[in-house]
Each structure stands twice: as C-alpha cells, then as structure tokens.
C-alpha cells in the first residue's frame, strides 16, 4: 500500500470503491462496476434523497463528469444499482430451488437463499426491501419485479408438484416468499440474535407446517 493510502487509512478516510485512485483509466465495464459499488454504499448509508452525485463520485474516486458519462441522473444510477442487487437475489433463489427434488429440502434451500443474500449482500437487501424511495414508480416497479420473480420460481414448483389450481398455488408461493423475507429481515435488523442455520430452520419448520398439508405428488 502506498504512503498516501496508509496516511488516508490512519486518518479514517474511505478509499475509493475498488481501490482505484482518482484519474486511473479503466475499461468502461470495470468503471461502471466500480461506480455501482460506490453508489450502493452511499445510497445505503444516506438514503436516496440525502445521497448526492458529488459524494458518490468522491466515494468512487472519480470526478462528477466521469460519473455522468455513465449515468445521466441520480435516478438512473439508483435503478442500475437496484437492478444489480435484484438480479443477485432472484438468481440465488432460482438456483436454490434446483438443488434437490426433495420438497422439504427445497423449501429449506429457498428460505436459506434469502438469508444468504442478507449475509453476503446486506446492502442489496436493504435497498430492495427497505429503500426510502418506493414512491417513485420506476423504483416500486423494480422492487415488485424482484418479489414477483422469486414468487414465480416457487409457484412453478408448487404447480408442477401438486394438483392445486393456479390461484391457490400462487397464494401459497406468495406466503412462502413473505415468510422468508420477513424472517430474514427480522434476523438482520436485530443483529442476528441466533445463528443463521437456526434462523433458517425455524422459518422452515413454520412454513413446512402448512406446506406439508398441500397434496404434493413428490415429498
């Protein structure tokens, strides 16, 4: 680490996201990723309304004109940050549901996917489920897409593995996702009062108590 970086660290100053100093030239995709990381940190720390493009550019170690070369407005930047986290969450849930054909284990995998997302991307979880800008239609739409995509993944499995008609299967899927989201949120916001495995298992036991009565063709 350079003397300048050491000095900044001793003073408690934050280094630019990605560790790049202002002025370093990066490939466009790499620079965009760096900006999204910095913006995510600032939006979580400050909220949408209090966050400023100056602060985001400074956190990323770039000038504000460079930031505007990639994102024409704060809303566009916020939506790009949100989409990145949404993609990670939905991908994790879908992948979890493909890990086994045992329905109880599949339920556990789905619940655990939400807790894993919190554990590895708490910034993303807060932006999706606790953001302060859901009154903006485009933001609300993206949050809705995230929830519905997770619900759709669960619904597809319930529909395929049971004789339930579509509306009943979807209501169950909506309930399972809501239980997972709220349990994981409680766990995060209360400083993880129990270990993750215990939190996941408790949520699964509660959900399975109802799901076990659904006439599944595979168990």
Curated annotation (Swiss-Prot):
The keyword Protein biosynthesis does not apply. Residues 29-89 form the HTH tetR-type domain. Residues 52-71 bind DNA. Residues 1-30 are annotated as: Disordered. Keywords: Activator, DNA-binding, Transcription, Transcription regulation. GO terms for molecular function: DNA-binding transcription factor activity; transcription cis-regulatory region binding. Disruption phenotype: Essential, cannot be deleted. FasR:DNA binding is regulated by long-chain acyl-CoAs (C14- to C26-CoA), which act as effector molecules that modulate the affinity of FasR for its DNA binding sequences and therefore modulate the expression of the essential fas-acpS operon. Pfam families: TetR_C_46, TetR_N. Transmembrane segments: none annotated. Homodimer. Transcriptional activator that plays a central role in sensing mycobacterial long-chain fatty acids and regulating lipid biosynthesis. Activates the expression of the genes encoding the fatty acid synthase (fas) and the 4-phosphopantetheinyl transferase (acpS), whose products are involved in the fatty acid and mycolic acid biosynthesis. Specifically binds to three conserved operator sequences present in the fas-acpS promoter region. Essential for M.smegmatis viability. This is HTH-type transcriptional activator FasR.
